[in-house]
Amino acid sequence: MASPCLTKSDSGINGVDFTEKFRLEDSTLLANGQVVLTDVPVNVTLTSSPYLVDKDGVPLDVSAGSFIGFNLDGEPKSHHVASIGKLKNIRFMSIFRFKVWWTTHWVGSNGRDIENETQIIILDQSGSDSGPGSGSGRPYVLLLPLLEGSFRSSFQSGEDDDVAVCVESGSTEVTGSEFRQIVYVHAGDDPFKLVKDAMKVIRVHMNTFKLLEEKSPPGIVDKFGWCTWDAFYLTVNPDGVHKGVKCLVDGGCPPGLVLIDDGWQSIGHDSDGIDVEGMNITVAGEQMPCRLLKFEENHKFKDYVSPKDQNDVGMKAFVRDLKDEFSTVDYIYVWHALCGYWGGLRPEAPALPPSTIIRPELSPGLKLTMEDLAVDKIIETGIGFASPDLAKEFYEGLHSHLQNAGIDGVKVDVIHILEMLCQKYGGRVDLAKAYFKALTSSVNKHFNGNGVIASMEHCNDFMFLGTEAISLGRVGDDFWCTDPSGDPNGTFWLQGCHMVHCAYNSLWMGNFIQPDWDMFQSTHPCAEFHAASRAISGGPIYISDCVGKHDFDLLKRLVLPNGSILRCEYYALPTRDRLFEDPLHDGKTMLKIWNLNKYTGVIGAFNCQGGGWCRETRRNQCFSECVNTLTATTSPKDVEWNSGSSPISIANVEEFALFLSQSKKLLLSGLNDDLELTLEPFKFELITVSPVVTIEGNSVRFAPIGLVNMLNTSGAIRSLVYNDESVEVGVFGAGEFRVYASKKPVSCLIDGEVVEFGYEDSMVMVQVPWSGPDGLSSIQYLF
């Protein structure tokens, strides 16, 4: 990591003048002169950020951020918990680890409200009516725990509203007592820009990761996918995969991605012979004590014989046959754990690198996370672990075999196991660096640098050290069809939890990886609820339906005939007025998320109330008293129009066309006009927000809406050209395309041919056929 200047100076750094936003005066941390933390201990230090430009040389707001550190008296240790001051009566939102592998959203107002293993905190600005440019009040403040040297940090509550920083190496052999840049604080008047600007500073400071904007997500993000997990669990086999793909193709929803999940590898129990595969393991959970025996696939896939050539066998033949038969299948991914399998490698396996059984050790913070079957099984049986100097050999062996078999990428699971195995390997930071470097090198060599879905990775170790190449990752806990603890209501409230996990986690993780909201099942009672969120998530869309059990009517609102999807330009985030609220168990707050398509905004409203984290029981549970019909308001200003790589200018826009997907109603609205929404439990509404433009030649007001048969309606709009007396819209997809027009057109043309159209409630309706192999059409509206 680069070493920042440790000297504060009112005259600036390197001759650049600035006024610092953060000051430490009289044991008080101030931002814009407003109190952030009080009773700051005397051993706490504040150092201005020295970084003048980002990695591209673009100037940074050098005054906006500072580093917090502290000196600790006494003998250096591997684990410290130190206060950086008291937080009192300031609303905050945070992201914390509720499981070893997964994080979620948490809100509060005082230091005592902070959860263990908190990865990020954002403090609200002062004054409920404050807004951008409010100036003199307290700005939004980001507090970000960092890595320093061989130590990693997180937040937790301390005594009497202290904000405590937990600093740990993970190994008693790695100790320290002085930290200079262990927390970064950043201030700004836009909470979304705040996080992005802060991450640009940390990108330069650490130089151990790349931001999402520097990378390209894999092509699977634009394809409809099918994952085998909930369809087969561990019984997945070539015949079943073939039948699953064929059923989707025959139903008009061909997948572009097939993800072969857990169940394809050669694994075994320690009690079995080294040549005995665990083929009788069929129940999820039974496989976790098993270890990898070899890089090659198990007999289910190894015994595959191509119907085209009896000599063509194994995974390679199966992959080739599947792609040859189903032309839309562009990508086949397979699952593997970071350490090979749930139980790691079998130490005596001759085809694998040498490994040693290590008993994982939970840190004090992890001991307070939710009980988890995977963690229990792993601790019970240990991990067959290849030392970090063998990690490159391990990934090369596994990934070279998969690439040779025609596999296009991997879902890497159980990523945050390393911190439990690091005692003898220099601590968690050094071990993570070694393993992630080896993984990155292999992915660059075998899977185009980006052919990875990261999973079970929700911790700052991975975000700061594992994302140099990886650009796609899960942002929520698993999609749970039912509650594994047996609560029948979990079929519903767990779905609300899933939405909130993904939406809020993306505010943090979306800076490093394209958010993946996970699979779902199209026949689940909350399937449409899930489908709506995936449609506007900005990430991949894939299902885990059992073979032959599909809701094709729903799927066709997500999937185009060529296996593509209508993906948003950005990634979905909570609306600004929901950042510091609790959409899971306050009984009143509706989740609202926003995203951008190429020419429009989109808002999603979801009633998620009914379950979530309980501090007392240390687990997610039902809060049935919070299940209510909710009413909320939304408006075009809920869309953050200036965000993303292609922001939409609304500087001269006076009116917006709002299209509600459920009722198919059109409303006209000003930027700040409120629209009231009422939603029953686990129901949703999607709203296309389209800026209205006046056509100069005839004063017709016009706004494109999109394909109303698709959940991401305006995602179908690929081009938009306004002429003096006409508008031309490029469309991707097929179905009923609508636009708002204040007057009825004289005629409509599709690809130069005059077509019939309808005009009702100020909407022009045209039926667009699927055009050619690429599904692109051009509609002209003549006025």
Swiss-Prot record:
EC number from the UniProt entry: 2.4.1.82
Catalytic activity reported: alpha-D-galactosyl-(1->3)-1D-myo-inositol + sucrose = raffinose + myo-inositol
Chain positions found as Phosphoserine: 9, 11
Keyword Transcription regulation: no
Entry-linked Pfam families: Raffinose_syn
First-tier enzyme category under EC: transferase
Gene ablation phenotype (knockout): Reduced drought tolerance, but no effect on freezing tolerance or on the ability to cold acclimation.
Record bears the keyword Phosphoprotein: yes
GO cellular component: chloroplast
Induction: By oxidative stress and cold treatment.
Function: Transglycosidase operating by a ping-pong reaction mechanism. Involved in the synthesis of raffinose, a major soluble carbohydrate in seeds, roots and tubers.
Protein name (record): Probable galactinol--sucrose galactosyltransferase 5
Record lineage: Eukaryota, Viridiplantae, Streptophyta, Embryophyta, Tracheophyta
Designated gene of the protein: RFS5
